[in-house]
UniProtKB/Swiss-Prot annotation:
Name assigned to this protein: Desmocollin-1
Chief site of localization: membrane
Tissue specificity of this protein: Expressed in the epidermis and inner root sheaths of hair follicles (at protein level).
Methyltransferase as UniProt keyword: no
Residues the record marks as carrying a glycan: N130, N165, N546, N613
GO MF assignments: calcium ion binding
Residues that bear Phosphothreonine: T385
Keywords linked to the UniProt accession: Calcium, Cell adhesion, Cell junction, Cell membrane, Cleavage on pair of basic residues, Glycoprotein, Membrane, Phosphoprotein, Repeat, Signal, Transmembrane, Transmembrane helix
Effect of deleting the gene: Knockout mice are fertile and born at the expected Mendelian rate. As a result of eyelid fusion failure 10% of pups are born with one or both eyes open leading to corneal damage, inflammation and corneal opacity or micropthalmia later in life. Skin is flaking and scaly at 2 days of age. Mice grow slower than wild type litter mates and are 30% smaller at weaning (21 days of age), however at 3 months of age they have caught up and are indistinguishable by weight and size. Thicker epidermis at all body sites with additional layers, principally in the spinous layer at 2 days of age.
InterPro entries according to UniProt: Cadherin-domain_protein, Cadherin-like_dom, Cadherin-like_sf, Cadherin_CS, Cadherin_pro_dom, Cadherin_Y-type_LIR, Catenin-bd_sf, Desmosomal_cadherin
Subcellular location: Cell membrane; Cell junction, Desmosome
């Protein structure tokens, strides 16, 4: 700290006293300051602190009129040696000046010594005055940080007004006494003097709040505890230091003067807002030191450039040795030094240039995708950045696009390649001019002119070689009419042999003819149509039909060309229209017709719409802009289908008749109409069965056949079998006679039944009267177990029959009605349940028979008793044989 003091007994002291005398006589006086101090002051003891800025702002010269005191810049007053205040007061003046003598101030300071009082003890018998306790007024006090002592050092004295009447004992408590830090303060209980036992670090403890107590000998406290605030005055014992040990800034090269580079910051642990923490920054050294490029603001620490001549290519890094000092940068302030690094960012301020001004190379003709040359460039900018990466351009000589130049990403070289064949017969040498730039845009340095593009010349020599045919041009266009019939010839594709400049010896072949329209003459290359040319074919795009032709020489070398057949439109398609029309009555009563014409625009619209006379009573047809027409109802029609014939013509009168199927529907939109369109209504179901459906049908049919066969077997086995004859038919119906001749002729049946059809043994038969003539249906009476069959075939007149056959016929005529009746009645009993059980009596039944009665009841009881067929008697066998023979 800057402390100005007078040393007695020296020449300087005399001059200083003279100067003080002048200041005292001519300076203005400020407000007087009074300080209460102990009567005994030791050397280097802080007496107090005054506010100098209230008297004079930023004084550059501070002097004391009393050599026993020195004053710091912050207003702190220190003693220079031990002092004993003999009188109660001692005064001196602080003289302030701005350094140039233009303004001077004087500040009066008065020191008052504290008086010692005589205490007496309070007697217990003395009455206690009835008064309320008072709170002591706190006494301000401060401690100097890092005080050198001697210790214990007197700090303050507390006294109670009750000491005038009683003997008071004093005590203190709080931080520094009975709390951390312990035993830093103590008090003399009799006098109230407070002492400090050791030095204090303000950065650790900036103040102490201690409570003082005043009590009598018997423990009575006449006053409230007194709060004592001991503030530790800062001592400039901490040097500032930079916040970061390693600081790196970057700034673009060629930047303008005054460009901010960065800001350095430092920290001082001393008391903020004081001179101890007022920091100043300074650049001590720049490495390299010439020329000077940087400066720093002393208060903010902001580093800026002082020149626009920063060039990364000359020096890419600078180091600055910095100093930060407290006490406002005064020489006696504490300081610290540090080093920061400033890196220059690259800018594209250097153009690339070729290492050679010209190059020569060669290449064979007709070679493609081959590298022919590499060119090297230099660039002083930072490698592998857009500022140094080269971009090559062919400026001249590549009008046909035969060459391409690229950049090798690894070496930054320019690579020249041939991408399109060169022809030795056309040109034997090509000269190229190539330029180079950087990927990044060029940045001009200060006061510098923009550079020009660096260029070089490349001479490419073309080497001759025996080559195949050339297809030039690659695409040839010929014209043809739409609808050209088959068998017509067209000019084809012609290739040339560059060695002979003719097409002799070449053979042609088509490799691309999508719709097979043409055939090619292998010698001349001309085309012949094999189909009718149709411009509306799906293979025709934009009126063009493409054909690929290959020309091959005798050595097998070939070239490929494309022949484009440009078809001229022909009016061969009438206008077409959608024949299904829907009119939604809820929305509108008309439909918009929009025909299309597959021909070109010259053979298309405007269209002319004509309505057939048969539909004019119900409909009107109005043309709209030649492309559309409106079909409108003359009046609201019923919801139904209507056929409307119309005719549409294109601009050349080519027309076609159409029958529209108009669906008048109750709907808002056609999709809501539930009436099926005509095509859907008339369409036959088109059902295609898959393999699984067919397999399912086959398996289902097989299963159904199995079920039917099973039912047939069960029914055949269990159903009721109607017997054709009872078991005793032979004995009951044959008359015993000794003659073989015919019996007595019977002309009428004993029982007459109406002619009817009865089911006997599941065979239809006609039952008539006995002796009736006519044709009889063949009948078969089959005995299952006997193996014999009784048959009746178609016969003629009974009179013409043989005698034996006549007897059999009479027997059959007699028994058949009766058997039919019985079968009929049994059937009625089975179905309607109205037949009664009865027994038919006969006059003669002959020998007993195993078959029993022929009544319906016995027949029902023995439906399946066919065992008698196994033991037929001889008479029945004879009759059966007779019946079988015919």
């Amino acid at each position: 700290m800057a402390v100005a003091c007078a040393a007695p007994g020296s020449t300087f002291s005399k001059q200083l006293l003279f100067f003080l005398l002048v200041l005292v006589l001519f300076c203005d006086a400020c407000q007087k300051v009074s300080l209460h101090v102990p009567s005994h002051l030791k050397a280097e003891t802080p007496v107090g602190k005054v506010n100098l800025e209230e008297c004079l702002k930023s004084p550059s010269l501070i002097l004391s009129s009393d050599p026993a005191f020195r004053i710091l810049e912050d207003g702190t007053i220190y003693t220079t040696h031990d002092l004993l205040l003999s009188s109660e007061k001692r005064g001196f003046s602080i003289l302030l000046s701005d350094g140039q003598g233009q303004e001077q101030k004087k500040l009066e300071v008065v020191l008052s010594a504290r008086e010692k009082k005589v205490f007496r003890k309070r007697h217990t018998k003395e009455p206690v005055h009835n008064r309320s306790k008072r709170r002591w007024a706190p006494i301000p006090c401060s401690l100097m940080e890092n005080s050198l002592g001697p210790f214990p050092q007197h700090i303050q004295q507390i006294q109670s007004d009750a000491a005038q009447n009683y003997t008071i004992f004093y005590s203190i408590s709080g931080p520094g006494v009975d709390k951390e830090p312990y035993n830093l303060f103590y008090i003399e209980k009799d006098t109230g003097d407070i002492y400090c036992t050791r030095s204090i670090d303000r950065e650790q403890y900036d103040q102490f709040l201690v409570y003082g107590y005043a009590t009598t000998a018997d423990g009575y406290a006449p006053d409230y505890p007194l709060p004592l605030l001991f503030k530790v005055e800062d001592d400039n014992d901490n040097a500032p230091y930079f916040e970061t040990k390693l600081t790196v800034f970057s700034v673009p090269e060629n930047c303008r003067s005054g460009t901010s580079v960065g800001q350095v910051t430092a920290i001082d642990k001393d008391e903020p807002g004081t001179l101890h923490t007022r920091l100043k920054y300074k650049i001590l050294q720049q490495i390299p030191d010439q020329p000077k490029h940087f400066s720093i603001h002393p208060d903010t620490g902001v580093i800026t450039t002082t020149t626009p001549l920063l060039d990364r290519e000359k020096c890419d890094t600078y180091k600055l040795v910095m100093e930060v000092r407290d006490m406002g940068g005064q020489p006696f302030g504490l300081f610290t030094t540090g080093t920061i690094t400033i890196s220059l960012e690259d800018e594209n301020d250097n153009s690339p240039y070729f290492t050679q001004t010209s190059y020569t190379t060669e290449v064979e003709e007709n070679r493609i995708d081959v590298e022919i040359l590499r060119m090297v460039v230099h660039d002083q900018d930072l490698p592998n950045t857009p500022h140094s990466k080269a971009v090559y351009t062919i400026l001249k000589g590549n009008e046909n696009g035969n060459f391409k130049i690229t950049t090798d990403p690894n070496t930054n070289e320019g690579v020249l390649c041939v991408v399109k064949p060169l022809n030795y017969e056309v040109s034997r040498q090509v000269t190229l001019q190539i330029g180079v730039l950087n990927e990044a845009q060029f940045t001009n340095a200060a006061n510098a002119q923009p550079p020009t593009m660096c260029t070089t010349t490349v001479t490419v020599k073309i080497k001759d070689r025996d080559e195949g045919p050339e297809c030039q041009p690659p695409v040839k266009v010929i014209q043809s009419k739409d609808g050209l019939p088959a068998g017509q010839e067209l000019l084809g594709y012609k290739a040339v042999d560059p060695e002979t400049s003719s097409g002799e010896g070449l053979r042609y072949e088509m490799v691309g003819d999508e719709d097979n329209w043409f055939e090619i003459n292998k010698i001349t290359g001309d085309l012949r149509t094999v189909k009718v040319l149709d411009r509306e074919s799906k293979f025709v795009k934009n009126n063009q039909y493409n054909i690929s032709v290959v020309a091959t020489d005798t050595a097998g070398r070939s070239c490929t060309g494309t022949l484009v057949v440009l078809l001229e439109d022909f009016n061969d398609h009438p206008p077409q229209i959608d024949k299904e029309v829907t009119i939604c009555q809820q929305e509108k009563d008309f439909a918009v017709l929009e025909p299309i014409d597959l021909d070109g625009p010259d053979n298309g619209p405007p269209f002319q719409f004509l309505l057939d006379n048969s539909s004019s009573k119900l409909w009107t047809l109005e043309s709209q802009d030649g492309k559309r027409a409106i079909l409108r109802q003359r009046h609201n029609l019923n919801y139904n289908y209507y056929s409307v014939p119309i005719q549409i013509q294109d601009r050349h009168g080519f027309s076609a008749k159409h029958v529209l199927s108009v669906r008048v529907c109750d709907c808002t939109t056609p999709t809501e109409c539930r009436m099926a369109v005509k095509e859907e209504r008339d369409a036959k179901p088109n059902i295609i069965l898959g393999k699984w459906a067919i397999l399912a049908m086959v398996l289902g049919s097989a299963l159904l056949l199995c079920i039917l066969f099973t039912c047939f077997c069960v029914t055949t086995t269990k159903r009721t079998v109607k017997k054709c004859f009872p078991d005793d038919v032979a004995q009951q119906n044959l008359i015993v006679s000794n003659t073989e001749g015919p019996g007595e002729e019977v002309t009428e049946a004993n029982i007459r039944l109406p002619t009817q059809t009865a089911n006997i043994c599941d065979t239809s038969m006609s039952v008539g009267t006995l002796g009736g003539q006519g044709i009889k249906t063949q009948q078969s009476f089959e005995m299952v177990k006997g193996g014999h069959t009784l048959e009746s075939h178609k016969g003629g007149v009974l009179g013409a029959a043989e005698p034996g056959r006549y007897a059999y016929t009479d027997w059959q005529t007699f028994t058949q009605p009766r058997l039919g009746e019985k079968v009929y009645l049994c059937g009625q009993a089975e179905e309607h349940k109205h037949c009664e059980d009865y027994v038919r009596p006969y006059n003669y039944e002959g020998k007993g028979s195993m078959a029993g009665s022929v009544g319906c009841c016995s027949d029902r009881q023995e439906e399946e008793g066919l065992e008698f067929l196994d033991q037929l008697e001889p008479k029945f066998r004879t009759l059966a044989k007779t019946c079988v023979k015919k």
